[in-house]
Each structure stands twice: as structure tokens, then as C-alpha cells.
Amino acid sequence: MGVGELRMCSERLSMMGTLSSEFKSCLQAVTEQPRIYADANVAAGLVAFMRDRLRWDVLFVIEHDDLRRASDQEHNRVARRLLRTLITFDRDFLENKRFRPSKNGGVVVMSVPDQRTRRRLLQSLDRNIFGGPVQHERRKALATSTIPLEGRKIDVHPGWDEQ
């Protein structure tokens, strides 16, 4: 193999990504919707709101027998592996020792008492974090990052978006 052939081979290899990077680029082409992992303590009605009203791509653990009784650590790992932002009401996910930000794909912890406020705050999250339907170009740009909140945690409560 000559120098020219080695250079061409090297250029081809540098153009190819890892399986993970190739998967991410395919995923970006398929969906611009926020990819959500809703754990077991998120109400089915709220999941329906995320899917129907906000048009989010939501994996709801209650609908999957193998995930329904998984530990919090397993939910965190699976959400990241599936390139999804985890949404929960479990405040344990805010503990940085147990759930290091560098080891998550983004976590949204909600602490909201009533359904109406939860929906309003999810709409705010859609607008301010995921780009929302009004900001279609921003949503497309965020889709290229695949997990917009990767390595971050947000404690969503009344007034969180006014700070």
C-alpha cells in the first residue's frame, strides 16, 4: 500500500464516525421532537399531554414491563443510553452524589401540586428549553444536540422560568 492509498484510507476513516455518532445522526434525521423518558411516577394523563399537545416523543416506563420496576439508577442509565431527557417527580434525582450530572442525559424534576400547573410548566419547558412549536428553527437546532439537557438537571416548580 503506497502513501497515496494510505492517505485515502485515512481520509475515509476520518469521515466515518463511531456507531454511536452514526446512530445520533440518524436519530436527528428522524425526529425533531424532544425525546423524553417519563418514569413511573409521572401520571398517564401528563404523558398523554406531552405526546398529544406538545408533540413530544415520550417513552413511558409504565408501558414497558422490563422498565416498570427498574431502580432509579437504571432509569438514569437507560434514559441516557436511549438519548432521552428523564422527567420525574422523584427529588432523589437532584442528589449529585447518587446521580452525577456528567452521567445523565438531562433530568427534569417536577415538584408541582396540581395538574393544571404541571401542564403550564411543561408548556414553559417546551418553549424555553426545547424550542417549542413557535420557535421551529430553534427546535431543529436543538435536535442536532440530540439531548438538549445532557449533563444538566432542572428543578421545575412554580416560578422556575421567571428566575
Regions found by a protein language model. Name each.
Residues 20-30, 34, 39-40, 44, ...:
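Acidic, PIN/NYN-like endoribonuclease modules and their adjacent C-terminal/linker elements
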Residues 62-68:
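Short beta->alpha junction loops
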